[in-house]
């Protein structure tokens, strides 16, 4: 069957290892597929429902993803209660919080980990996470990823139009007259400033 990489809920990717191959063979195929520009700069979920990996093996996967400007958002296992985020530069494992609704003005969500919002973030709504923030809708509110100082955190949205966007200690705002985004975008830190690119 071979190692698979496929879209889950945009903009994340699902990486499913081939249990019929050795871990080293999976790593080789993963790097080969990630070398395609299509997958670079993505956020990924690694499916471990068919096999178990040691912390050292997880770190090797994360190292390859980092090489191609990608990042592990979390690990999916057969036991959903054990799904944990395991990033090599984070000493404490953190989980993914899923919000299945639109956040309206005045609402506030804070979480020590990654936040996935299936809905919009309206103006004057606040989202604060120590990890990544992904919005499956339009982001018009105030967001702060990497709130504990994690400069590798990213913010992604199908339409990125925030009142205020912060990653770690870096801050930016949308222009007053900003055109409607035509594609999903991500915000990240590079060279001590926030960049916004299409996905």
Curated annotation (Swiss-Prot):
Keywords: Cell cycle, Cell division, Septation. Gene3D superfamilies: 2.160.20.70, 3.30.160.540. The keyword Cell division applies. Disulfide bonds: none annotated. SUPFAM superfamilies: Cell-division inhibitor MinC, C-terminal domain. It holds the Pfam family MinC_N. One of its GO terms (biological process) is division septum assembly. The keyword Cell cycle applies. InterPro entries: CAP/MinC_C (IPR016098), MinC (IPR013033), MinC_C_sf (IPR036145), MinC_N (IPR007874), Septum_form_inhib_MinC_C (IPR005526). Belongs to the MinC family. Cell division inhibitor that blocks the formation of polar Z ring septums. Rapidly oscillates between the poles of the cell to destabilize FtsZ filaments that have formed before they mature into polar Z rings. Prevents FtsZ polymerization. Interacts with MinD and FtsZ. PANTHER family: SEPTUM SITE-DETERMINING PROTEIN MINC (PTHR34108:SF1). This is Probable septum site-determining protein MinC. It comes from Persephonella marina (strain DSM 14350 / EX-H1). The gene is minC.
């Amino acid at each position: 069957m071979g190692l698979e990489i496929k879209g889950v809920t945009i903009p994340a990717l699902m990486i499913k290892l081939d249990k019929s191959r050795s871990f080293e063979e999976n790593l080789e195929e993963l790097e080969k597929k990630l070398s395609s520009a299509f997958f670079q700069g993505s956020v990924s979920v690694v499916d471990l429902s068919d096999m178990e990996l040691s912390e050292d093996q997880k770190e090797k996967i994360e190292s390859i993803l980092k090489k191609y400007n990608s990042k592990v958002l979390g690990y999916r296992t057969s036991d959903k209660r054990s799904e944990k985020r395991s990033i090599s530069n984070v000493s404490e494992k953190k989980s993914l919080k899923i919000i299945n609704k639109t956040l309206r003005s005045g609402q506030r969500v804070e979480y020590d980990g990654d936040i996935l919002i299936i809905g919009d973030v309206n103006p004057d709504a606040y989202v604060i996470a120590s990890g990544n923030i992904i919005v499956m809708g339009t982001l018009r509110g105030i967001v702060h990823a990497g709130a504990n100082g994690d400069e590798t955190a990213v913010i992604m949205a199908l339409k990125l139009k925030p009142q205020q966007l912060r990653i770690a200690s870096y801050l930016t705002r949308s222009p007053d007259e900003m055109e409607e985004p035509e594609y999903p975008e991500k915000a990240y830190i590079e060279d001590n400033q926030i960049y916004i690119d299409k996905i």
